[in-house]
Amino acid sequence: MIKPGSVFSPPQTPAARCLHLVRLNPIITRSELVEATGLSQPTITRATAALLEAGLVQERTDLTRTRGRGRPTVPLEVADNKWILAGIAIGTSRTHIALFDTMGRTLREDDISTPVARLSESDFIEHIMAGVNRLTTGISRTLVSVGVTTSGNVDEDGLVWAANLGWEGVDIAARLRYQFNVPVVVSSAIPAILGSETQSADLNQTGKVLVLFADDSTGAALSTEAGVTQLVPLPRISSELLNLHDSASEDNVATQAVLDALAAREISASTLAEAATIAEDNETARGILDERAHLLASIAADLVTEHNPVTVVLAGSAFIDDPHAAKLFASSLRQHNTDAQLRLIPTHREIVRAIARAVALDPLLRVPLSLQPSTASVRS
């Protein structure tokens, strides 16, 4: 079992802390690791020895430095030990599958059509397993872990609850674990957005970061020194225009709810981008899209008041496919007197690739010495 810590928690073991720092610093010495971690010299020596034995770091003997009569200082760097880390980002209609090496470089990737809500759980998982098998074919490397991100929420038992996928308590991890005989982690896509940032942050980085994701599903997550936490449930919302009265946010500001609100007014749009185009010449459509932006700002304001983040990250088609939404959101949020900095992830592709990499690397960065090449990576 993968431990310690939950998915996207900061590195806790000496080996994990050392690997994190070696990844962030192209060349670093053991003495510098002692200083950066606050751990003792013997602890660092044991941790780096274990990482060297696992092939996760290597010594740069060509950069050996000698100072006085002491022992020579040999710097360390990340090594490529021929492992494969698979990352799977499940979307409403498409799934992104990518393979990474231990340095976080993309080896292969693919997007496959997976209209999840129209597929049985078994058929969908078969599609995913086939996709991973296709990508790993012909690579002289060994799969050591699989990470999965999905819409909705993932409970403490790893079960997925996602209305837009039609999933209620789906245990995707068990099937993948059996198929590939490697550790599998499952996370909501929303914490994974922050996970991708914490994995490249300094160990001593302070300041909370909040992410608000609005797309086919809606959610938020918060990163603190203790790790990344999905914020469930979201603050409730009310809107006369949308006939919402102290209603749950998760479904009522998702894209389908917006399209349904347009359809109720005889405005037909199959995507948010199409709705935004219609709204250029249709005041009713524009009003509904604007209301969504204001409601999202209201949700964010409540979360900022409660958690006091330094930065709010915006992600999802609500802020991308509607060209007016991000500006309206920012203006509305400022009316709530928040000083939090706003940052937008500008493309869906960037989000998908980032979360696939983050969830793929999570086991390696959290428990690097627990991953071992399987003698039977794939079951027939």
Which residue stretches match the model-derived regions?
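Gly/Ser/Thr-rich loops at beta-strand to alpha-helix junctions
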Residues: 93, 153, 191, 215-218, ...
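Glycine-rich beta-strand-to-loop/alpha-helix junction loops that act as flexible
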Residues: 146-152, 214, 312-318
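Short glycine-aspartate micro-motif
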Residues: 75, 85-89, 143-147, 208-213, ...
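Glycine-rich phosphate-binding loop and adjoining helix at the ATP-binding site
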Residues: 106, 115-208, 324-335
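Glycine/GP-enriched mid-protein hinge/lid loop-to-helix segment characteristic of carbohydrate kinases
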Residues: 109-111, 119-121, 164-168, 172-285
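Short, ordered coil/turn segments that flank beta-strands lining enzyme active or ligand-binding pockets
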Residues: 81, 102-103, 155-156, 216, ...
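ATP-binding/phosphotransfer module of carbohydrate and carboxylate kinases, centering on a glycine-rich
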Residues: 1-60, 69-107, 119, 123, ...
